[in-house]
Amino acid sequence: MIKLRLKRFGKKREASFRLVACNSTSRRDGRPLQELGFYNPRTKETRLDTEAIRERLGQGAQPTDIVRTLLERGGLIEKTVRPSVTVGQAKQTAKREAAAKQAAKDAAEAKAAAAAEAEAPAADAEASEG
């Protein structure tokens, strides 16, 4: 299977990357099948060979997560909703709903306790008068 991935080059702590097409079993910095672009994370400079990338994607090449993000920014592929994002949002929504239910329950209990307390002194006053 062909992967679109980043190949690291540059000095220590000053890495730059080439966007390459390579076999999925090859090493990260091994010989690529084709160089498709360039990415410098320090300056955010990105150069993409759009025709070659579209051709590789048409042949079934799979981009890695970082490369997918770069291609989305470049407008070559549509943004995708990643499952982890939707799962995280679902968990947050469920947590908010549970907190709201608990707050409503606590408020109802406090209101019932206040009503019971208000009735208790009235009952004591009637008993002492009678």
Swiss-Prot record:
<dbReference type="GO" id="GO:0003735">
    <property type="term" value="F:structural constituent of ribosome"/>
</dbReference>
<dbReference type="InterPro" id="IPR000307">
    <property type="entry name" value="Ribosomal_bS16"/>
</dbReference>
<feature type="compositionally biased region" description="Basic and acidic residues">
    <location>
        <begin position="98"/>
        <end position="109"/>
    </location>
</feature>
<comment type="similarity">
    <text>Belongs to the bacterial ribosomal protein bS16 family.</text>
</comment>
<feature type="region of interest" description="Disordered">
    <location>
        <begin position="98"/>
        <end position="130"/>
    </location>
</feature>
<dbReference type="Pfam" id="PF00886">
    <property type="entry name" value="Ribosomal_S16"/>
</dbReference>
<keyword id="KW-0689">Ribosomal protein</keyword>
<protein>
    <recommendedName>
        <fullName>Small ribosomal subunit protein bS16</fullName>
    </recommendedName>
</protein>
<dbReference type="InterPro" id="IPR023803">
    <property type="entry name" value="Ribosomal_bS16_dom_sf"/>
</dbReference>
<dbReference type="InterPro" id="IPR020592">
    <property type="entry name" value="Ribosomal_bS16_CS"/>
</dbReference>
<dbReference type="GO" id="GO:0006412">
    <property type="term" value="P:translation"/>
</dbReference>
<dbReference type="GO" id="GO:0015935">
    <property type="term" value="C:small ribosomal subunit"/>
</dbReference>
<dbReference type="GO" id="GO:0005737">
    <property type="term" value="C:cytoplasm"/>
</dbReference>
<keyword id="KW-0687">Ribonucleoprotein</keyword>
<feature type="compositionally biased region" description="Low complexity">
    <location>
        <begin position="110"/>
        <end position="130"/>
    </location>
</feature>
